Amino acid sequence: MTILSADTLSITRPYSNSLSTLKVIATPVTESPPSPVASSISPNATNLVEEFINAHKELQSYKSGRPVVLDGHTLSIAAVAAAARYDAGVELDDSPLVKDRLLQSRQVVADKVEQGTSIYGVTTGFGGSADTRTDQPILLGNALMQMQHSGILPSSSKPLDALPLQDPFGLAMPESWVRGAMLIRMNSLIRGHSGVRWELIEKMNDLLRANITPVVPLRGSISASGDLQPLSYVAGALYGNPSIRVFDGERTSALGPRKIVSSVEALEAHSISPISLACKEHLGILNGTAFSASVAALALHDAVHLTLLTQVLTAMGAEALAGTRGNFDPFIHAVARPHPGQIETADVIWNLLEGSKFATTEEEEMTIDEDKGHLRQDRYPLRTSPQFIGPQVEDLIASLATITLECNSTTDNPLVDGETGKVHNGGNFQAMAVTNAMEKTRLSLHHLGKLVFSQCAELINPTMNRGLPPSLAATDPSLNYHAKGIDIASAAYVAELGYLANPVSTHIQSAEMHNQAINSMALVSGRATITSLEVLSLLISSYLYAICQALDLRALQHELYEGLDAIVKEEIIAAFSPFLDDYEITRFTAISCHIVRDAMDSTSTMDAKDRMTSVAASLTTPLVDFLTGEAFSDVVSAGQALTTIPAFRARIAARGYELLDELRRAYLSGGRGLAPASRFLNKTRPVYEFVRLTLGIKMHGAENYNDFENGVGVDDVTTGQNVSLIHEAIRDGKLQPIIVDLF
């Protein structure tokens, strides 16, 4: 077994503001031979931050007018998102190399058909019916289309006789999925392995340019011989099947689909002539994983954002919970347990907590008596977050590589080698690579959700949140249950994530005359992953909302504790200066301030008046002990001092209540500004201010402070409406530039 010497450990790149990733090189001690195990444990460093930033910059360039260029080899996930979701322009690489490759493969097919050679899907039946033969390949293609146009869609947009249980148009795929699939299928066909014409790929691009999107059934693909049924609706739109409908016209609302018309009508409206498909082209369009890859690419594009957002919120959660930066110290992660995802995650959070006035950034050793009764470490959701998030980062990096490769592959059968003239029968349409990537991603999304939920629950719970009020109530908790609804809803979200995390691939069924006895269910797995993304974004939105409220309350608490320290000092001097010298006053003031802060932390569930009475009462026993201790040999003086305690307590309670009420009014009325916690934050401040200033979400509690004098929902919108604004900012990418700028 190899022994690693401590003095041979060297860190090649320390943590820095650039959030670079640590690499640890361990040199074996020469007294023992190298171990094959030790020599194999040097995993590649992850850099999800770089992936995220590069993808964001690439997407912005497409949104600014740069076209997505298809050459069969360089299509990125960001490019898929740009064309699918933001209507980015698409251009085909029309270089001689690309067009010649297409021409060669097309010529192979044409020659073999002319020679009467038997080719699967051109002169034979399909799948389990491949024992049939025909010399009419065009009619065979028509039969293929007829067979695959079997999906269930709403037959009309007219009012229904009965209110449906679900949105009828939920039977159709979102347009973004279809646009992404068309893009990926074009990129596969342009590689020149499918025997199709250049004109066919151009015609597909004509539909994208005209913003004509086929209405495609949501369900019906097992993603085994590719996504046959969904792609058949794309093919039907290309050749103008009047029974195939498309989305056309302007988008007038975020709710509901665009105008739905027949493909013939849409093509005529945009002066696009339908294409007559040649032999092999029917199958060439259908027999691929484009829909599975599209949904997977779009899912991963957002999954990267949510994974990094989870890390950012963990840093903000550490601030809101008065946690410690030491959880993310480089020694723990880069030296002691150098899993690459763990290292990168710790690196991100470590840097984000630099300069925070809420988190403990410099830990000090204490005696047993000094930290008695205090939790010595942060709880697991904060302290072990790098170890929990890190493996998800690694799986996500692997999934990104898999799906990027899938988007630049030929997923067809048969395949045509234009150089040798050979036709290959295989199974590149089997999308299990996509399925595995989606199963991993969906499970990771659940784990991230579980972490976020645990942190959020801790933040809302007064027994765990280090002195914050229950349910993050900014006013008396007996009449303010602010975040309790968020707590309950978050439990629902994470439970659903757990259900969605179950694999789809374990439910594969034999299909199509037992020819497709194994299949991938990749599209279904991708759909489930999209649903998981939606649920996780709801959970993250709720947590970010709660964090901002907690940060404001922590800022208020900071002012309150400073004010209480001053009150305690003033009242001790006023009450006991006749009996104590300056040294004793100073010593007892320090003791009292510590007691008051502890009492404040333990009484956060009480209304203000009762709370301050209890806090003041907590000084009674220490006062009696102090005033009857060694400092008082004079019994008469001690007795006189003891008689002042009731009045002293009353003044502390009254002034403490007035201070708390004054601070509540100031914070809730905007007297401390719209973002009162900003001055305590450093690197996470832009995210907090995005919520408070850009989205205009105020600290909650004004209605409660004013006893609902104007009714509920008059002075402020609902909590759900505010969380919805955050969710929309995440969903629509408005928060992404803020996150990018953090790094």
Swiss-Prot record:
Q: Where in the cell is it found?
A: Cytoplasm
Sequence positions bearing 2,3-didehydroalanine (Ser): S225
Q: Which Pfam families match?
A: Lyase_aromatic
Main localization category: cytoplasm
Q: Null phenotype?
A: RNAi-mediated knockdown results in delayed primordium formation.
Question: Which GO biological process categories is it annotated with?
Answer: cinnamic acid biosynthetic process; L-phenylalanine catabolic process
Q: Where is the active site?
A: Y120 (proton donor/acceptor)
Query: What cellular component terms from Gene Ontology apply here?
Result: cytoplasm
Provide the GO MF annotations for this entry.
phenylalanine ammonia-lyase activity
Write the record's keywords in alphabetical order, separated by commas. Answer: Cytoplasm, Lyase, Phenylalanine catabolism, Phenylpropanoid metabolism
- Induction profile: Induced by thermal stress.
Name the positions where (E)-cinnamate binds.
N287, Q377, R383, N413, K484, E512, N515
Q: Kindly state which reaction or reactions the protein catalyses.
A: L-phenylalanine = (E)-cinnamate + NH4(+)
The EC code for this enzyme is 4.3.1.24
Question: Which InterPro entries does UniProt cross-reference here?
Answer: Aromatic_Lyase, Fumarase/histidase_N, L-Aspartase-like, Phe/His_NH3-lyase_AS, Phe_NH3-lyase, Phe_NH3-lyase_shielding_dom_sf
Q: Does the keyword Lyase apply?
A: yes
Q: Give the quaternary structure.
A: Homotetramer.
Q: In which family does this protein belong, per the annotation?
A: Belongs to the PAL/histidase family.
What this protein is called in its record is Phenylalanine ammonia-lyase 1
